[in-house]
Amino acid sequence: MSYFEHIPAIRYEGPQSDNPLAYHHYDRTKRVLGKTLEEHLRIAVCYWHTFVWPGHDIFGQGAFRRPWQQPGDALERARQKADAAFEFFTKLGTPFYTFHDTDVAPEGDSLREYVDNFARMVDYLGERQQASGVRLLWGTANLFSHPRFAAGAATNPNPDVFAWAATQVRHALDATHRLGGENYVLWGGREGYETLLNTDLKREREQFARFLSMVVEHKHRIGFRGALLIEPKPQEPTKHQYDYDVATVHGFLTQYGLQDEIRVNIEANHATLAGHSFHHEIANAFALGVFGSVDANRGDPQNGWDTDQFPNSVEELTLAFYEILRHGGFTTGGMNFDAKVRRQSVDPEDLFYGHVGAIDVLALALERAAVLVENDRLEAMRRQRYAQWDDAFGRKILSGGYTLESLAADALARGVNPQHASGAQERLENIVNQAIYALR
C-alpha cells in the first residue's frame, strides 16, 4: 500500500522552477568545500512530529486523519506507520531518520509487553532500512509522555520509575546499536522540577548523574561506537530543567566526570527558550568541546514555548553553519528536523512542503556559510583582534610565567597604558550580509 501515491519523488529542479514539490536549492550532489551537500547536511526526518503527532494541542483534539493513526491492532498500525515513514523518507530523498522507542512500537500494558513489542518493531525497521538504504541518525527513549514520568525519570523520587526508565534506555540503546545508529540522544524532558518546595536538588542531580553513568557503561559494554548526546532545554514541560543550556550541561558533565563521554544535541528552539541564539549555543558547544548534532527548527519570537516550526531563516542558519564548517563539520551528527506542520496543515502534501522548503533553506545557508569560510575575512579579523596574545608577553601570561604579584609589578615597571581598539562589529556584520545576499 502507498500512503503518498500522488506525491512524486522530490528532485532538484533549480531556482527557476515553480514546482512546490521540487528542490530549488538543494542539489545533493553539488560539492561545497570538498563534500557534497548531502554529506555536509546529513539530513534526518523525525518520526514523532511527522508520523506520531495527531495534530492536537492543549485546546483541541487531533486534527489529522492519518491512515496509520486509526483504531486497530497496535502492532499492525506500527508496521503501517513504518511503511508510511520509509515511503516518505525515500520520496524526500533524505539519508537519515530519528525516533523515540514509543514512536515506533506500542508501549503495551506492561514492561514485558513494551520489550516484546519494541523488539518486533526493531526487526521490522531493520528490514525497511535494508530495503530503502535509509539510515538511523539517532534513537532515544521517551521518558516524558507517560504519567509515571510526571516527576521525572532518572530524577524521580520513586526508584521503580528509575528502573523502568533504565529498562527503556537499555533497549533503546541496544536497538540503536543494532540498527546502525550513529548517535544516541538523552533528552531529560522532565528531569527538572515544578516547585522547590518538594525538591531535593542535590539528590536529583546525583540520581541523574548515576543514570548517565549507567548509560555510558552500557554503551561500552555492548560496543556501541556512536556518540551519546544530551539535548539541552531550559523549561517545558517542567518549570526548570537540569539540562538548561550547553554551558549548564557541560558543567554538570564535568562535575560528575562525564565530559569525555557525552556531547550535546542542540535544538534551535531550545536555544531561544534559554535566552540564547542558535549561533551562540553551537559556538559554545565547540568552545567547550561537546558539539555533537543539531535539531533544526525555529520558534516564534512572540510565543514563549517550543513551537517546533520548520526553519526558514537563511540568515540565522548561515551563522550556525559557519561555526559548524569552520570547526570541520559534522562527524556522527547531522541536521534532524525536529519540526512539525501546523495543526491546520492537514493534507499529506503539507508534510512534504514543510520538509522541502526547510531543506532548501539549509542548502542556501550552508553555501553562504562556505563563502564566509573560504574568504576567511571574519577569521582574519578575529585572529588580528587577539594577535597580541600570540606574542611572547601574552604566551608567558597564559603559560604560567607570571604570578598575580609579578605581573602587577611588571605592569607598573613598564608603565602600561593600553588603548581601546575598535571591535569593528558593523564591518563584520556587513561581511556576513555580503556573503548572504551577493548575487550569484
UniProtKB/Swiss-Prot annotation:
Binding residue positions for Mg(2+) 1: 231, 267, 295, 338
Keyword line: Carbohydrate metabolism, Cytoplasm, Isomerase, Magnesium, Metal-binding, Xylose metabolism
Any one GO BP annotation for this protein: D-xylose metabolic process
Keyword presence, Magnesium: yes
List of residues binding Mg(2+) 2: 267, 270, 306, 308
EC number: 5.3.1.5
GO cellular component, one term: cytoplasm
GO molecular function ontology, one term from the record: magnesium ion binding
SUPFAM superfamilies with a match to the protein in the record: Xylose isomerase-like
Cofactor(s) needed for function: Mg(2+)
Entry superkingdom: Bacteria
Family in the record: Belongs to the xylose isomerase family.
Subunit organization: Homotetramer.
Protein's recorded name: Xylose isomerase
Organism of derivation: Burkholderia multivorans (strain ATCC 17616 / 249)
Gene that specifies this protein: xylA
